[in-house]
Structure formats: structure tokens, C-alpha cells
Design a protein with these regions (language model features):
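Internal catalytic domains of large membrane-associated glycosyltransferases
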Residues: 1-254, 258
Length: 266
């Protein structure tokens, strides 16, 4: 990874960095893994870029002195592709004055604007044709230039959508609201929670291309992981939750967010 980033920097300028996390023993999973999976990676990266923690990475090419102007982070999965200009469009949408996020007095919930945006996600043309299973279940792959904006119940009626793990977020607001909000080893599917805390918006006119499970077995494995994660966030339907420190606090999520959690289960 370090060599690849060096090669890219030689070709395009010094704009690429590579980080690799240490694996630590997780007694719940009985294996060595990155702390708190993707959620932990984002939290560690956020706190490191903001100067709140020292370098937590095993390999790291970031010059932290050059990172003080970072405002937004685009997060993707390994099988997600940014389409042409989609990154710039996401930044433009986040920077719009009407989308500026405002946090409540306790500092644990975005109450207006948006600190997170979720683009529309489609299945790549190649991904949709890589096996008989994907040809049957993945639907039409690629983009449709005649259908740029789609309707969404939550976005159209409540000015917020559902986060599915690919999008852009405000670095400082994400850290302020979520750094100490979720207890370790309790949540597998964190996307819906993060979207609820940060008041995620759906930008349906901006599209990313995603992969699709190539077989029924991989599809069921992913579905099992999703369902397991959905049940793990049921405590957020109550009036109180436990934060990262194990302290009981008032659940800041509003009724709409709780309905999203409930509807995901049923």
C-alpha cells in the first residue's frame, strides 16, 4: 500500500496517503481484528486528523501538518466506485449554506442541516453481469442518463434519508457527536445510527456504483450480517442508552429515527 501511494504521488502529485491499522484481540469475536471494524477506523481517523489522538496506525504516510484544513471525509466500501465528478458534487452539496449542520445544546445530535450525505447507489454494469445470480437479482446495472433524481419517502417529507455506509460527512461534527456515543462491541451495523445522529440527507441526483454478491451463499452471508446488526441497535428504541464509557444517558434520537430502526426489523 505504501509503495502504491508513492507511485500515485509520483504520477499525480503529493495527494495520496495510505494507512493500515494494527489488529488487536477481540475477545467477543475470538480473533485479531481492527478495533470496532469500519466504525472504529473512521473514529480513529477522525480523531487523528483533528489532533485529538496520536498516530493509531501501524503504517501511515499522512503528514498531519498538512491536514489542518480537512473539512469533509468521503467514505466508501472496497467495492464502491466514485462516478465522474460525484466527489466534487458531494462536496458542493455539503458546502451549501442551507445544509450547514446545527448541533443541539448537549452536542449529541444534529437538529438542522446535514452533517452527512448519502448519494444514490447503483450496481455497476460489470458487477450486474458477473454471474447468473447477479443477472437475475442485481437488476439493471450502470447508470440511466434520463433518470437522475428519484423520489424517497423520508427525504421528500422529512428532509433526511437513510445512511447505507457510502457518502460524505463533516469531520468535526462527526467527531463531536459520535466519538463517545456508542459502546464498544455492541453494534455491527452502525450506518443507520450514524445517519440518525448526523441527520443524513439523500442526494439522489449524485450516483455511486457498488458491487453485488456474486452467489446466493455470499448474498445470504451479507443478509445475515445486516439482520444481526439491525437487532443490535434495538436499544436505541428506548429512552436511555449506554455510551462508550458505559454511562447511562438520555437517548437523543427523535421519533422518526426510531421508526427507521423499527421498520428495518419488520
Amino acid at each position: 500500500g505504501i509503495e502504491q501511494s508513492k507511485s500515485l504521488n509520483e504520477k499525480y502529485g503529493n495527494i495520496f496517503n495510505f494507512v493500515y491499522r494494527k489488529r488487536i484481540w477481540n475477545s467477543n469475536e475470538e480473533c485479531y481484528m481492527g478495533w470496532e471494524r469500519k466504525r472504529g477506523l473512521l473514529n480513529q481517523l477522525n480523531e487523528y486528523l483533528l489532533g485529538n489522538i496520536t498516530n493509531p496506525f501501524r503504517a501511515n504516510t499522512i503528514d498531519i501538518s498538512q491536514m489542518n484544513k480537512v473539512k469533509y471525509i468521503i467514505t466508501l466500501d472496497s467495492d464502491t466506485d466514485l462516478t465522474l465528478k460525484s466527489g466534487l458534487e458531494l462536496v458542493g452539496a455539503m458546502a451549501h449554506i442551507l445544509n450547514k449542520p446545527e448541533v443541539n445544546e448537549r452536542g449529541d445530535l444534529v437538529i438542522s442541516g446535514h452533517a452527512l450525505m448519502q448519494p444514490r447507489v447503483g450496481v455497476g454494469l460489470v458487477e450486474s453481469r458477473k454471474s447468473i445470480f447477479t443477472q437475475v437479482y442485481a437488476g439493471e446495472g450502470g447508470t440511466d442518463s434520463y433518470t437522475n433524481v428519484i423520489s424517497n419517502l423520508y427525504q421528500d417529507n422529512f428532509d433526511e434519508g437513510i445512511f447505507t455506509g457510502k457518502g460524505i460527512y463533516d469531520l468535526s461534527i462527526f467527531s463531536k457527536v459520535l466519538a463517545n456515543e456508542i459502546k464498544e462491541n455492541t453494534v455491527l451495523s452502525h450506518d443507520l445510527l450514524e445517519g440518525s445522529y448526523l441527520r443524513c440527507a439523500l442526494t439522489s441526483d449524485i450516483m455511486l456504483m457498488d458491487g453485488y454478491p456474486s452467489s446466493y451463499i455470499s448474498f445470504r452471508t451479507r443478509l445475515y450480517r445486516w439482520i444481526r446488526g439491525d437487532y443490535q441497535i434495538l436499544p436505541w428504541l428506548g429512552k436511555t442508552i449506554e455510551n462508550k464509557k458505559g454511562e447511562t444517558k438520555q437517548n437523543p434520537l427523535k421519533l422518526l429515527s426510531k421508526y427507521k430502526i423499527f421498520s428495518n426489523i419488520v
